[in-house]
């Protein structure tokens, strides 16, 4: 063998090139579609690569993670929503493994079907409430100064009304007007009932509260999902506790010859006893929260309105008027639970990003607010 043949470098096989292309495709699929963190993208990359709106994030302290091409989202915080989801999944799986067959043949198949329906609906509403757009308002719509490409600082002081709450015109003499407030961070006039969430750092339509267990704001577009999630979660826990209770104490009917005492029953069916205790403990927080939101929706109030204007207000001069109350409990309940349409998203994350779109640009807060 000659020296040239001995030290020559063979070309890379086509299989190796195809493997590298596959790895690159998988990496792009995972980081750009399946799970996307816009803060990890290189600044200015949207100018070279055709990007979607969810892949562009220039605002400070706005930390979202997007899933499935921007169709789902979650705030970059402690993953308490993951713990909540696991706490819903595990009891359902244990039920189907250890309880479903026994209930099907010893009690009634319809109970298994009913619980499965409750569980699936709970999971569905959990995903919708925790990972959908709650009604985020677009930024930089009402900027009180001219914008140039080189500088995004205010050119002049904005008018005084940008620093005060103004009231819309109203007819009734015994009612106060609906107040509007300008958000210095988002640079928009907020619609009535909208509020700025300090966690999401965004203005939300009909902002109710920021739920740490769902890791998402609860607003106009997902409040209905939140209500039904609470309802079916409570119903599922009650049904599971009853089913597990029946299984544990089935020996009392004299139909279980191998079990004669409570100790022997929980020794033979430990998962049934565990599910019974788990479902009862799981009711401690969701059940009172459900009752509280039934009360709020009966008056068409939000959580923020109740705690800021109703609860603990002793000064008669600070009279709060709920302009959204229809004065009918049933109509208020219908509006919040069934009647109100979800509406469309004002910031469509799946649309193609247009370079220079002011909604996604970083602008400094107004000077009077930042001082």
UniProtKB/Swiss-Prot annotation:
Q: Which residues form a coiled coil?
A: none
Single GO molecular-function term? protein-cysteine S-palmitoyltransferase activity
- Might you give the EC number(s) for this enzyme? 2.3.1.225
Question: Membrane-spanning regions, if any?
Answer: 80-100, 107-127, 226-246, 275-295
> Does the keyword ATP-binding feature in the UniProt annotation?
no
Topological domains, Cytoplasmic: 1-79, 128-225, 296-371
Q: Where in the cell is it found?
A: Endoplasmic reticulum membrane
Residues exposed to the Lumenal side: 101-106, 247-274
**GO CC, one annotated term:** cortical endoplasmic reticulum
Task: Provide the top EC class.
Answer: transferase
Its membrane topology is listed as: Multi-pass membrane protein
Q: Active site annotated at which positions?
A: 211 (s-palmitoyl cysteine intermediate)
At the top level of its lineage, which domain of life is listed?
Answer: Eukaryota
Q: Name it.
A: Palmitoyltransferase ERF2
Give the organism, scientific name.
Debaryomyces hansenii (strain ATCC 36239 / CBS 767 / BCRC 21394 / JCM 1990 / NBRC 0083 / IGC 2968) (Yeast)
Gene (UniProt): ERF2
């Amino acid at each position: 063998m000659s020296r040239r043949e001995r030290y020559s470098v063979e070309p890379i096989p086509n299989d190796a090139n195809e493997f590298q292309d596959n790895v690159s495709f998988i990496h792009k699929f995972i980081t750009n579609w399946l799970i996307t963190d816009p803060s990890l993208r290189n600044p200015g990359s949207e100018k070279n690569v055709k990007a979607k709106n969810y892949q562009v994030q220039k605002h400070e302290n706005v930390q979202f993670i997007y899933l499935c091409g921007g169709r789902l989202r979650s705030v970059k915080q402690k993953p308490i929503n993951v713990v909540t989801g696991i706490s819903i999944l595990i009891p359902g799986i244990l039920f189907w493994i250890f309880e479903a067959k026994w209930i099907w043949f010893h009690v009634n198949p319809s109970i298994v079907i009913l619980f499965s329906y409750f569980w699936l609906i709970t999971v569905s509403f959990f995903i919708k409430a925790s990972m959908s757009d709650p009604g985020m308002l677009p930024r930089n719509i009402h900027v009180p100064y001219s914008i140039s490409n080189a500088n995004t600082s205010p050119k002049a002081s904005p008018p005084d009304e940008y620093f005060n709450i103004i009231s819309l015109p109203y007819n009734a003499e015994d009612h106060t007007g609906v107040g509007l407030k300008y958000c210095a961070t988002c640079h928009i006039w907020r619609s009535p009932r909208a509020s700025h969430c300090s966690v999401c750092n965004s203005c939300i339509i009909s902002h109710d509260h920021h739920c740490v267990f769902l890791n998402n704001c609860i607003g106009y577009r997902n409040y209905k999902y939140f209500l039904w999630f609470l309802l079916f979660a409570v119903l599922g826990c009650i049904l599971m506790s009853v089913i597990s209770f029946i299984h544990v104490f089935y020996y009392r009917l004299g139909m279980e010859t191998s079990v004669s005492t409570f100790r022997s029953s929980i020794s033979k069916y430990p998962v049934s006893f565990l599910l019974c205790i788990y479902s009862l403990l799981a009711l401690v927080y969701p059940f009172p929260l459900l009752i509280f939101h039934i009360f709020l929706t009966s008056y068409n109030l939000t959580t923020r309105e109740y705690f800021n204007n109703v609860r603990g207000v002793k000064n008669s001069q600070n009279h709060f008027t709920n302009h959204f109350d229809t004065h009918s409990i049933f109509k208020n309940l219908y509006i919040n639970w069934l009647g109100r349409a979800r509406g469309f998203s004002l910031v469509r994350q799946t649309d193609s990003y247009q370079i220079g779109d002011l909604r996604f640009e970083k602008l400094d807060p107004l000077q009077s607010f930042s001082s």
